[in-house]
Amino acid sequence: MEKKFYLVREDILPEAMKKVVLAKQLLERKKAASVAEAAQLANISRGVFYKYRDAIFPFQAVTKENIVTLFFHLEDRSGTLSQLLSVVAAAGCNVLTIHQTIPLQGRANVTLSVSTNDMHEDIDELLAKLRGLEFVEKVEIVGSGVY
């Protein structure tokens, strides 16, 4: 039987599933030496861990071998695209395409397609850094796919 997949917001996930993701991260980052320790630190039973471990994955884990397309709404200032690309490059992303609109009324839209193969941080961390840039008014993921 073919399995179906859904992209679901974190705030509607059951607490047990969120804790399984936490336990998996603890194991991946070597903060826990065993499943038993990770389950204990995440405050779940080993049974819950084993029940859901192969069924839930953070979005960034699914995008490890993908192209991610990001949309930005930026203030039109000198050097903004350069700073934006520096943050993306520092995360280990390889920029594949750039599309920038002509600035109108002091604003410009930029769409970046990046390869996340060599990315060394979570996509959420990268998005937080990008949102922290003072000239970024909006950033969102508009697509992702395997190439």
Curated annotation (Swiss-Prot):
Annotated PROSITE patterns: ACT (PS51671)
Gene3D superfamilies for this protein: 3.30.70.260
Domain ACT span(s) in chain numbering: 69-144
Similarity annotation: Belongs to the UPF0735 family.
Protein known as: UPF0735 ACT domain-containing protein GTNG_2535
Organism of derivation: Geobacillus thermodenitrificans (strain NG80-2)
Origin organism lineage: Bacteria, Bacillati, Bacillota, Bacilli, Bacillales
